């Protein structure tokens, strides 16, 4: 499954300026996803993070990964009228700054479901270089 921005807007409840996934390159719904966030200088967070040395906040990289994971879950045909709520992160690591002009590659792999909580192993990369990673826990809820 691939998605453009128009498809993503229909899947996720987020909107500008907090929609942080631009395109889905590939997705095996419920199992794995590879998506893109194009990081541009026009992002509002660059106004104050940091003037003269813009860096994408790590928490927003994690949020991008959480949104990609939500698309992975919500892409299943058996899931309708639901929303995915981010519950927690484990083992978050930030390895390299993400700056304007970077294409952030978001990869998320389903690792399990326990008591209604989805577990995803996530990695964000620029090119072939890993810039961040975390384990994300999320829960599916009615809209």
Swiss-Prot record:
The keyword Repressor appears for this protein: no
Catalytic residue positions: 49
Compartments, as annotated in UniProt: Cytoplasm
Classification via Pfam families: FabA
A Gene Ontology molecular function term of the record: (3R)-hydroxyacyl-[acyl-carrier-protein] dehydratase activity
Listed NCBIfam families: fabZ, PRK00006.1
Name used for this protein in its record: 3-hydroxyacyl-[acyl-carrier-protein] dehydratase FabZ
Biological source species: Wolbachia pipientis subsp. Culex pipiens (strain wPip)
